[in-house]
């Protein structure tokens, strides 16, 4: 055999061997493919096809097709469960044999109108179907919100029973406030009544205004301690968990999406304002009478609009004093009794403007998002970029702008190990001024807020009336005083899951939430004023703050089936660690050396600096057991131990827990009501906590002139967190696989209320935080889901939610007291009193019956006597020989009865005016 012949034989043998090895390898792979269709025969895109035991998950294509390729090394002819799940459909599963070669398995999914098979992860130690929950958890998916709002909370409004969502401000970028099942704290100063927020496993410290709602996949809401116990000492207000989008349900390839929204935002309806006044005018109502000493009324008149121009145009850095108009009561002046008969809002302004409408505009709103979702090999991903701009409804204010980037990655490392990354960066600019809108509502009807003088300057004083400190022009303030706040935030989570055995999972995750903001404001030198005759020297303020929070948790889950697979059990052990640090600093001063210089060094006098640091540490340990017998009886229990640096030194560790049970009556063999497709009774009782404010446990002092220390708050080493104990009972009913009804009653007792108490004078401190009360909330919630149209091409259903919560102060260990509720002029409106409804407004009422007067005055009350009933049904003082109709005829208005001669001897009585009890 020649060398060339030998070489050809060797080459042929090697190639044959290679092809045979390759063919053998291919033959060992297992390929599972199929279609997932709806009950209407339509392909379902994004349905999740899973083999749990092998940690394999893949999504369907737009044609509803899925393909799973299992490497030959994992193909052993074993049995496995193939599951398919899609939002809004009843999941299905098939037992398959994982063998070499190809097999086709198709699924037809039925519509799940009430989503009883939907999986939730909040409040439970592992993913659990809604129909097997022993307490209520509300879930809103991206399918429920096809048009995303400007912030995540607005998307929940009206969709969750028991959630009270209020937009207290229409300011661009402002997030609504939310309370779940009523307030949890009588005094929440330095804290919050809002629920704990978790974003992709990260305990949020920076709110939700920075989160792009279009990135959200679903939101789960746990409304009370009966469900939130597993989160311990910071979950008494409930929990909101947000899960952002990922590529877990994607098939091989990349899908791009772009969404652009344009619109305007305005203020509905008209703000009511008086178009007439009480000031004295000439006969043809074109000019206003000026009060001049020694000159009769209307001896001199002026054009009020020309007067407003004069005082603004001829003034330098300030407005000139205007003429004094007859009967100009202004805000604080009391007109004399001589002209009382003219004091009716009956004189018209010659020209009427709408101050609020002048200041408002239909501000533009833009929301644009570009994202990509896909799978490449073992890597799933979701990336997005978003810009949101909202000008707002107030002119001259730039509003709010947010830029957001997100990258979510899921990586399958081996058959039993995977990890995921969730990350988001946000940069926002807030250019809002909070006082402009309030000030414009105080302008009278003759104000022109955008009028300019001969020098092109906006009027600093819009009207010539005596408006006091509120007489400055809000438009001038908005044009020349521009506060600015820049916010940067990064939220990230790294999670890794390992399944060494089919019945054992281990998971570790660490989350980070970092936020920084820089705020600046400046009133420049020469800023015009209305009440000062000297040049405004200016003021400057700069501040910055940075906070970060780190939370980590290690979890072990063990599962086992007993009694020939009739009883499924799950044991979860978890430990967690949290750290939160924040630092702030600022500075500023007055008397700016140079106008236009935006630097704190420009301040010459009253220079100041501020700063603060907070550090919080917390530990947690959890054990949770869940038992499920034949899908009929579900029993669960958990115990959690928490330690937090916010607790008093002698109360560092606290214990929380939960016991729950559900009975799926419709799964009983004897239950033969064909129309009832699902019936579940449930009960759960649990405890959770609300932590004290940062400074509550410490002694605090204020630093005065020369560094002198003054005692402020007395420390308390025995301070405990508030403890929320809630019992929740409910029934879930589905009829004809269509109509869903959920009824829930929750009784929540929040003990150890954190309240400021006045300590003994000998202590030398003005206040001390103590556990000194109890608040009780009772809540009813009803949700009814009614499918109206169900066809192949259109599904339309309506959900009706109703809830009612009553909050009572059931125990108070301090003297009853008033509080203002952070509302101007409400210092004695709200009262904390045992046995009273929390939030009740207190005041005084008018006397309607003679018998309500002191006994010495009852004989003086009646027709023809000193006290008579007026046409409105109130008892008023008339005096002897007068009637309630003699006010103008006898010139009795504004005559007064001294307090010493009046009932109760406290209040002066005005003639004809109702009497306060």
Where in the sequence are the language-model features?
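Short, acidic, small-residue-rich periplasmic hinge/interaction motif at the N-terminus
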Residues: 35-52, 81-90, 99-146
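N-terminal, post-signal-peptide soluble/periplasmic segments
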Residues: 127-128, 133-148, 152, 159, ...
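Short, acidic Ser/Thr/Gly-rich low-complexity loop/linker segments typical of extracellular
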Residues: 55-65
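Short, polar/charged loop or turn motifs at beta-strand boundaries
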Residues: 35-39, 135-158, 166-170, 178-188, ...
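Cleavable N-terminal targeting peptides that direct proteins into the secretory/outer-membrane pathway or into
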Residues: 1-31, 76, 90-92
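Extracellular/periplasmic, surface-exposed regions of secreted and cell-surface proteins
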Residues: 408-414, 422-427, 465-523, 534-833
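Short acidic/polar hinge/loop motifs at secondary-structure boundaries
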Residues: 66-67, 73, 154, 200-227
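Conserved small-residue
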Residues: 257-344, 770, 789-916
């Amino acid at each position: 055999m020649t060398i060339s012949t030998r070489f050809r034989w060797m080459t042929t043998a090697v190639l044959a061997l290679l092809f045979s090895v390759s063919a053998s390898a291919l033959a060992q792979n297992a390929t599972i493919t199929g279609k997932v269709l709806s009950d209407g025969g339509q392909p379902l895109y994004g349905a999740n096809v899973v083999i749990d035991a092998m940690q394999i998950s893949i999504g369907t294509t737009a044609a509803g097709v899925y393909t799973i390729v299992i490497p030959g090394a994992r193909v052993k002819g074993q049995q496995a469960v193939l599951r398919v799940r899609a939002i809004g459909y009843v999941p299905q599963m098939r037992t398959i044999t994982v063998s070499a070669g190809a097999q086709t398995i198709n699924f037809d999914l039925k519509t799940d109108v009430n989503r009883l098979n939907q999986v939730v992860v909040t409040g439970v130690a592992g993913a659990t179907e809604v129909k097997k929950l022993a307490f209520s958890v509300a879930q809103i998916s991206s399918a429920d919100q096809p048009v995303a709002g400007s912030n995540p909370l607005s998307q929940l409004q009206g969709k969750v029973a028991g959630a009270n969502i209020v937009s207290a401000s229409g300011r661009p970028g402002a997030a609504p406030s939310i309370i779940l099942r009523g307030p949890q704290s009588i005094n929440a100063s330095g804290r919050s009544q809002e629920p704990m927020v978790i974003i992709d496993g990260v305990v949020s410290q920076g709110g939700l205004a920075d989160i792009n709602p279009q990135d959200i996949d679903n939101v789960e809401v746990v409304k009370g301690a009966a469900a939130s116990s597993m989160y311990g000492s910071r979950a008494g207000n409930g929990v909101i968990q947000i899960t952002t989008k990922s590529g877990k349900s994607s098939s091989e390839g990349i899908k791009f999406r772009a969404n652009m929204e344009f619109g305007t935002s305005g203020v509905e309806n008209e703000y009511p304002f008086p178009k007439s006044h009480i000031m004295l005018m000439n006969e043809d109502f074109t000019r206003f009478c000026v009060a001049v000493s020694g000159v009769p009324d209307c001896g001199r008149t002026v054009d009020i609009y020309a007067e407003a121009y004069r005082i603004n145009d001829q003034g330098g850095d300030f407005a000139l004093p205007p003429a004094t108009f007859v009967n100009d009561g202004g805000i604080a002046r009391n007109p004399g009794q001589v002209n009382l008969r003219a004091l009716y809002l009956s004189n018209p302004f010659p020209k009427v403007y709408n101050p609020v409408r002048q200041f408002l505009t239909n501000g533009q709103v833009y929301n644009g998002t570009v994202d990509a979702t896909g799978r490449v090999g073992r890597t799933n991903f979701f990336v997005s970029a978003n810009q949101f701009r909202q000008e707002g409804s107030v002119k001259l204010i730039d509003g709010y702008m947010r830029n957001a980037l997100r990258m979510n990655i899921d990586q399958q490392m081996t058959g039993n190990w995977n990890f995921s990354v969730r990350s988001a960066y946000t940069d926002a600019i807030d250019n809002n001024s909070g006082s402009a809108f309030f000030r414009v509502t105080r302008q009278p009807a003759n104000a022109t807020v955008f009028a300019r003088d001969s020098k092109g300057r906006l009027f600093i004083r819009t009207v010539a009336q005596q408006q006091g400190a509120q007489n400055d022009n809000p438009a001038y303030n908005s044009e020349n005083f521009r506060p600015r706040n820049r916010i940067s935030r990064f939220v990230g989570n790294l999670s890794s899951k390992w399944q060494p055995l089919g019945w054992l999972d281990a998971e570790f995750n660490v989350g980070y939430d970092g936020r920084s903001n820089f705020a600046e404001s400046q009133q420049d030198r020469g800023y015009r004023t209305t009440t000062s005759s000297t040049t405004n020297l200016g003021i400057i303020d700069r501040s910055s703050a940075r906070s970060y929070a780190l939370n980590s948790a290690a979890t072990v889950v063990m599962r086992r089936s007993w009694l020939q697979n009739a009883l499924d059990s799950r044991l979860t052990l978890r430990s967690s660690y949290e750290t939160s640090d924040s630092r702030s600093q600022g500075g500023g001063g007055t008397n700016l050396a140079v106008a236009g210089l935006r630097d704190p060094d420009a301040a010459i006098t009253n220079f100041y600096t501020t700063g603060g640091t907070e550090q919080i540490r917390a530990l947690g340990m959890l054990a949770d057991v869940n038992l499920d017998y034949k899908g009929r009886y579900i029993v669960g229990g958990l115990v959690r131990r928490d330690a937090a640096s916010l607790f008093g030194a002698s109360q560092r560790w606290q214990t929380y827990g939960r016991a729950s049970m559900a009975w799926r009556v419709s799964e009983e063999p004897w239950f033969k009501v064909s129309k009832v497709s699902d019936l579940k009774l449930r009960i759960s009782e649990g405890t959770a906590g609300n932590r004290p404010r940062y400074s509550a446990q410490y002694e605090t002092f204020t630093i005065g002139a020369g560094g002198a220390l003054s005692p402020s708050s007395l420390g308390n080493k025995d301070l405990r967190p508030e403890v929320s104990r809630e019992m929740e009972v409910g029934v879930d009913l589905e009829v004809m696989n269509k109509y869903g009804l959920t009824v829930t009653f929750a009784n929540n007792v929040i003990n150890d209320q954190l309240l400021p108490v006045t300590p003994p004078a000998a202590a030398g401190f003005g206040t001390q935080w103590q556990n000194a009360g109890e608040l009780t909330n009772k809540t009813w919630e009803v949700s009814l889901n009614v499918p109206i149209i169900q066809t192949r091409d259109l599904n339309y259903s309506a959900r009706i939610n109703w809830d009612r919560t009553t909050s009572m102060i059931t125990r108070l260990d301090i003297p009853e007291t008033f509080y203002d509720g952070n509302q101007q002029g409400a210092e004695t409106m709200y009262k904390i009193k045992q046995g009273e409804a929390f939030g009740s407004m207190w005041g005084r009422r008018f006397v309607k019956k003679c018998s309500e007067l002191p006994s010495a005055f009852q004989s003086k009350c009646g027709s023809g006597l000193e006290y008579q009933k007026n046409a409105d049904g109130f008892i008023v003082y008339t005096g002897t020989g007068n009637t309630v109709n003699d006010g103008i005829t006898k010139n009795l208005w504004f005559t007064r009865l001294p307090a010493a001669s009046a009932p109760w001897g406290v209040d002066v009585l005005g003639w004809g005016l109702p009497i306060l009890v």
